[in-house]
């Protein structure tokens, strides 16, 4: 079992439109970071008797591949301080619906990178030509219906090329 969000630094610098009568918080200008991955949000969160209503979109304005690597769980990644990287990655998506004890908002998160690379200082070879095209989707609001489409994962180490596709469902 891997905890994907353990000791993750989250920062948010935002101007919010606050409607106290409706318990509604609307994102105006904002800049957020999950570790070093920058994100921008549009939309709102509203507190209701049943839970919380989400109508949010989000995206990375731009992000180096190194910032994206910072999202890898600590169980799989050592320090990234001295890792050389090149290329960019993007994360975008939406969450729309009500969060309750039994339901989550419907969501779609797209993760992409094209022609990125990284190399740890103590390893002789780099990982190059990294292509990622992944989507994490929930179309029903039931957590067990969440699925992951790994439409493409490709990279090379020296002359060896790795290609993968997968669909992960409950």
Give the role of each language-model region.
Residues 1-50, 59-67, 85-100, 109-169:
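Hydrophobic lipid-interacting interfaces of membrane-associated proteins
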Residues 2, 78-81:
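Extracellular loop and loop/strand-boundary signature of outer-membrane beta-barrel proteins
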Residues 24, 74-79:
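Extracytoplasmic loops and strand-loop junctions of Gram-negative outer membrane beta-barrel proteins
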Residues 68-73:
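Short, flexible, mixed-charge acidic loops at enzyme active sites
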């Amino acid at each position: 079992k891997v905890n994907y969000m353990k000791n993750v630094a989250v920062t948010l610098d935002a101007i919010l439109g606050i409607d106290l009568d409706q318990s509604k918080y609307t994102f105006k200008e904002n800049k957020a970071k999950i570790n070093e991955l920058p994100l921008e949000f549009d939309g709102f969160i509203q507190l209701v008797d049943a839970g919380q209503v989400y109508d949010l979109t989000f995206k990375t304005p731009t992000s180096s591949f190194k910032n994206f690597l910072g999202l890898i769980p600590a169980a799989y990644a050592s320090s990234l301080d001295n890792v050389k990287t090149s290329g960019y990655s993007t994360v975008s998506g939406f969450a729309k619906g009500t969060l309750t004890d039994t339901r989550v908002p419907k969501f779609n998160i797209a993760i992409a990178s094209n022609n990125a690379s990284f190399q740890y200082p103590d390893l002789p070879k780099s990982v190059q030509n990294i292509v990622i095209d992944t989507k994490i989707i929930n179309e029903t609001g039931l957590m067990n219906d969440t699925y992951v489409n790994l439409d493409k994962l490709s990279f090379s180490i020296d002359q060896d090329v790795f290609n993968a596709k997968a669909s992960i469902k409950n």
